[in-house]
Amino acid sequence: MSSSQGGGGRGKAKTTKAVSRSSKAGLQFPVGRIARYLKAGKYAERVGAGAPVYLSAVLEYLAAEVLELAGNAARDNKKNRIVPRHIQLAVRNDEELSRLLGTVTIAAGGVLPNIQQVLLPKKGGGKGDIGSASQEF
C-alpha cells in the first residue's frame, strides 16, 4: 500500500507548470496584462476575477472582426499587406463597426469613395441615337 503518490504529505511535492489565464480561457489576448491595466487605471477600487477575461475576449473578437474585413479589403485591391486604407474601408463599409467607430479618425485611412446621385450623368433620356452628340443644341 505504500505508493509514491499518496502517503500523507511525505516526499517531494509535485510541481505543476504554470498555466496562463489566457490559455485557460482559450484566448490570444493577455488576460493578466489587461487585469494589471484595469487595476492601475483606477476605474474602480476593486476588479473582479472575470472582468479582465471578459474584456480580453471582447477585444480579441473586435480585433479579429476588423482584421478579417480589412484582409478582405486588401484581397479585393489585390494586395498582400493590410494598410490603414484597408482598415478604413473595412470599418466604414460595415454598418455596426462604422457606428461603433463613428468618431474615430484612422490615420492615413483616406475617405470612402462617394459621388452624390445628383452629380451623376442622367441614364438614357429619350432619343439616344448612336453617334449623336451628348448635348442637344
Swiss-Prot record:
Region (Disordered), start-end ranges: 1-21
Keyword Phosphoprotein tagged: yes
Similarity section: Belongs to the histone H2A family.
Modified residues (Phosphoserine): S134
Domain of life: Eukaryota
UniProt key word DNA-binding: yes
Protein name as annotated: Probable histone H2AXa
Record text about domains: The [ST]-Q motif constitutes a recognition sequence for kinases from the PI3/PI4-kinase family.
Sequence motif [ST]-Q motif, residues: 134-135
Annotated organism of origin: Oryza sativa subsp. japonica
